[in-house]
């Protein structure tokens, strides 16, 4: 309806154009953005952070941003965003990309790990619930248009209320509304809160087995995936940052992460497995055939926090979809997860940071 200030830039691996703007009201037809045209293979849009909207345009190869500007409303035409792209070679693309980055950004070291949180011995255990996706990243969606980001947020809020009602836990959500949070920031949020448990909540989609794929699946971290399906799911979930237009970690970041896992995460992984088994025990009858799996999920890589990812159901299955949008079902499964969390802490196997 009016001209806004925008910031347009390129990202690599994969090739993307990012358009950042103030919080705007996107009024687009349902399902738009999936059609290919010229250099563009797809695009998406949404709230990226409070007060900030983002458009992410997927590009099929190396490119240059020739022009980018916003036209004022004129002659009954609304304000229009214009971005001209031209194809180029990989060398030129990389040179322009490097040229566009501020020197301090290019040379910046990875951010340090948050300082450990010191808590009183009698403090309540801290639990961080992580509703996956959000904002510009909807996650998967059902044939009816029910999105993963919405069902997992509703479920996380239900579980938070149940946990807080016990009076035994201090509970936080990584996001409380329809905003996007990069994977690294989700982990850092849990570390800053001094979490004793981290539970990432998602919903799955498996169109090849619409009727057969049903129920919850519990995942723990493993550098070697338990099976091909777990590996594919981890790849998809780890791609969340790219979908939202976030630069992916460099190889050096991965080396640091792997060192941290080797040094600090062995015992944490054991605790995560104990927690996962507790969930499986309480969700009996509501589980997928392969109820417990493992793979290299970035969001589970906190070296000091027992972390589990749960896919609460399949949006590709009509029966599961009905459950996922049902208040009664959410309440019932939330009660089971509270029992699983109670059981984990009652065993007191690990000295998790409370």
Predicted regions and their residues:
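Short, solvent-exposed loop/turn elements at domain surfaces
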Residues: 7-9, 28-29, 92, 136-140, ...
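Short connector loops/turns at beta-strand edges and beta->alpha or beta->beta junctions
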Residues: 24-26, 132-136, 168, 313-317
